[in-house]
């Protein structure tokens, strides 16, 4: 039997660093959405007690450094599963891009193994496993428009956003999330008013929403990679309603209220970077 799961990418409409916790991790406040740029995870059972991963992408590890492997390993150990599993990853989401590719693949693996082995895990049990892997995995288990708090383990659904078009631009380099978080100075970092952004979403005020969007990590990443600032400026000059880095970068996204605007932004970026995508929000 094969189990198929779609693994959509995520964007951070807002990312605020509230402070550093005693354990060295950071307290976060984020608003995230899912987009129709997807990886696909296919899982089948093996008689031999092992975890085998293969992929159509050469840009990711296929061993225990992969978040998908970690998800399967945790579940096998936690539930005493002595059977093996083969996991096939079909990648469309760029790697090390701030789009949650590894996290959404891990979340899809958790959902798939829950079905394959009839584990009957509820949402909270899956979140507990996901949080052991990474701070974005709990969100990726459910996706949609959500407020994410704590270290990523608290996920509160928000209303679906009005339809809009999104253009993604991924520069030709990746970013290590850990390296960006190591450079955070909580006293001087720029802050984002997540409460205002949340209010704009709750009131369906698109103009206030785009004005309220922000990312506390953006300045840190731009200092090391100024091309991100150039991409943002180019998008805005082409008519984007807002241009913002997602996650720890380097991907920049723009939101556009009409497809005509999105096409202008897309065409202006197509020759500037190799990886440019026009996508929609998942509803």
Curated annotation (Swiss-Prot):
Active site: 10, 136
Annotated TM spans: none
Enzyme Commission numbers on file: 2.7.1.148
Function: Catalyzes the phosphorylation of the position 2 hydroxy group of 4-diphosphocytidyl-2C-methyl-D-erythritol.
EC class of the enzyme, as a word: transferase
Gene coding for it: ispE
Gene3D superfamilies for the chain: 3.30.230.10, GHMP kinase, C-terminal domain
Protein name, as recorded: Putative 4-diphosphocytidyl-2-C-methyl-D-erythritol kinase
List of residues binding ATP: 94-104
Native organism: Streptococcus agalactiae serotype V (strain ATCC BAA-611 / 2603 V/R)
Keyword Nucleotide-binding: yes
């Amino acid at each position: 039997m094969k189990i198929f799961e779609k693994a959509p990418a995520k964007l951070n409409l807002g990312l605020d660093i509230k402070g550093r916790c005693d354990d060295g991790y950071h307290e976060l406040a984020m608003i995230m959405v899912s987009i129709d740029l997807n990886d696909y995870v296919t899982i089948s059972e093996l008689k031999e007690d092992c975890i085998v991963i293969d992929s159509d992408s050469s840009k990711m590890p296929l061993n225990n450094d992969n978040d998908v492997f970690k998800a399967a390993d945790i579940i096998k150990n936690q539930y005493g599963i002595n059977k093996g599993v083969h996991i096939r990853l079909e990648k469309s989401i760029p790697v090390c891009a701030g789009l949650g590719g590894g996290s959404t693949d891990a979340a899809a693996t958790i959902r798939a193994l829950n079905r394959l082995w009839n584990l009957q895990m509820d949402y909270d049990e899956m979140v507990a496993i996901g949080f052991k892997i990474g701070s974005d995995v709990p969100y990726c288990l459910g996706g949609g428009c959500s407020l994410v708090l704590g270290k990523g383990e608290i996920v509160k659904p928000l209303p679906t956003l009005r339809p809009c078009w999104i253009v993604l631009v991924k520069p030709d380099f990746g970013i290590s999330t850990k390296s960006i978080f190591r450079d955070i100075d909580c006293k001087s970092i720029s802050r984002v008013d997540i409460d205002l952004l949340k209010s704009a979403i709750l009131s369906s005020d698109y103009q206030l929403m785009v004005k309220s969007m922000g990312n506390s990590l953006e300045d840190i990443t731009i200092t090391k990679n100024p091309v991100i600032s150039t991409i943002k400026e180019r998008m805005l000059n082409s008519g984007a309603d807002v241009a913002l880095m997602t996650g720890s970068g380097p991907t920049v996204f723009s939101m556009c209220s009409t497809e005509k605007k999105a096409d202008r932004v897309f065409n202006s970026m197509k020759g500037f970077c190799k990886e440019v995508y026009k996508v929609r929000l998942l509803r």
